[in-house]
């Protein structure tokens, strides 16, 4: 015992026991003492055997599960060895995935002491959270969406093609009605259509605007010929009424393709009206210029004639005066 106590006394100098006091003790000590102290160092009597029991290296704590593994090569090798030694592969592959929880014995020497989930369940959870499955599902959904879009696009294309085909057919029929020859089935329909065209031409002629010069020149003719003036006095409304009455009687001629011809005739008549008005204006200008030139020529001729007459009269008077003077 004496030798053991001597050993303890020799070890006392090597070890220092540091004790941290509480806040209340510090307040009491500061009140009792003049100078404040935060820490207090005391020497404790410890034996080497007790030191061996209390202190343990980090590897032992790691094996007991009291320390987390550090990311260092030796510790990683230890973890790999522990995982290789721990046999749970047979249990995992022997049981199906859809079964319930499998209780596996966990020893105190393994670092899985804090885990309450079995390895099979952990693998199942990891398989449920596998990103490849989610990518496959996402790709399948994308393919379905693409198929739906393709079906819609094909439907739209077919609808566009059908609408374009109908438009092209309608335009072809319309153009054929312009350039095709109109075939009259009945003589009465042909005669009525010809009479209608003649009436339209007469209406367009009556509705034409005549230039100013032609109106001046044609005034005495209209006054002399009462029949012509009566025909020109026909109003546009009367002609339109007659045209409406004839169009109601000639519905069969419209079905044979006379509408495009009437449209063409109206367009040509409108263009001819514009040309006639332009030509009438040009003629009016020319006629006014010619009249002015004639008036100038006539005035010059009159002036020359008057001058010549006055000169001849003056000469005759002079001759008579000279004769009287010689006689007297």
From Swiss-Prot:
GO terms for cellular component: plasma membrane; plasmodesma. Keywords: Cell membrane, Membrane. The keyword Chloroplast does not apply. It comes from Arabidopsis thaliana. GO terms for molecular function: kinase inhibitor activity. Disulfide bonds: none annotated. This is Probable membrane-associated kinase regulator 4. Residues 213-253 are annotated as: Disordered. It is found in: Cell membrane. Its main location: membrane. The keyword Membrane applies. InterPro entries: BKI1/MAKR1/3/4. Residues 223-240 have a biased composition (Polar residues). The lineage of its organism: Eukaryota, Viridiplantae, Streptophyta, Embryophyta, Tracheophyta.
């Amino acid at each position: 015992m004496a030798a053991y106590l001597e050993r303890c006394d020799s070890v006392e100098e090597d070890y220092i026991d540091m004790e941290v006091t509480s806040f209340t003790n510090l307040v009491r000590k500061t009140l009792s003492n003049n100078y404040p102290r935060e820490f207090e160092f005391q020497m404790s009597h410890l034996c080497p055997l007790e030191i061996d029991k209390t202190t343990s290296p980090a590897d032992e704590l790691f094996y007991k599960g009291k320390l987390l593994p550090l990311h260092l090569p030796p510790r990683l090798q230890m973890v790999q060895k522990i995982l290789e030694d721990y046999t749970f592969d047979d249990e995992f592959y022997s049981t199906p995935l859809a079964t319930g929880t499998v209780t596996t014995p966990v020893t105190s020497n393994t670092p899985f002491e804090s885990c309450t989930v079995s390895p099979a369940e952990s693998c199942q959870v990891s398989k449920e959270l596998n990103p490849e499955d989610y990518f496959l599902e996402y790709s399948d959904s994308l393919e379905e969406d693409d198929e739906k879009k393709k079906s819609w696009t094909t439907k739209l294309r077919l609808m566009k093609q059908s609408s374009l085909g109908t438009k092209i057919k309608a335009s072809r029929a319309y153009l054929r009605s312009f350039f095709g020859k109109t075939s009259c089935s009945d003589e009465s329909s042909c005669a009525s259509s010809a009479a209608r065209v003649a009436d339209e031409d007469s209406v367009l002629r009556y509705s034409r605007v005549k230039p100013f010069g032609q109106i001046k020149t044609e005034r005495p003719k209209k006054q002399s010929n009462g029949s012509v003036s009566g025909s020109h006095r026909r109003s546009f409304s009367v002609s339109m009424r007659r045209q409406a009455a004839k169009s109601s009687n000639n519905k069969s001629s419209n079905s044979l393709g006379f509408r495009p011809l009437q449209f063409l005739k109206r367009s040509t008549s409108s263009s001819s009206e514009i040309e006639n008005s332009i030509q009438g204006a040009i003629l009016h200008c020319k006629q006014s210029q010619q009249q002015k030139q004639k008036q100038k020529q006539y005035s010059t001729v009159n002036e020359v004639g008057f001058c010549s007459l006055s000169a001849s009269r003056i000469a005759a008077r002079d001759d008579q005066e000279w004769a009287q003077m010689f006689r007297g």
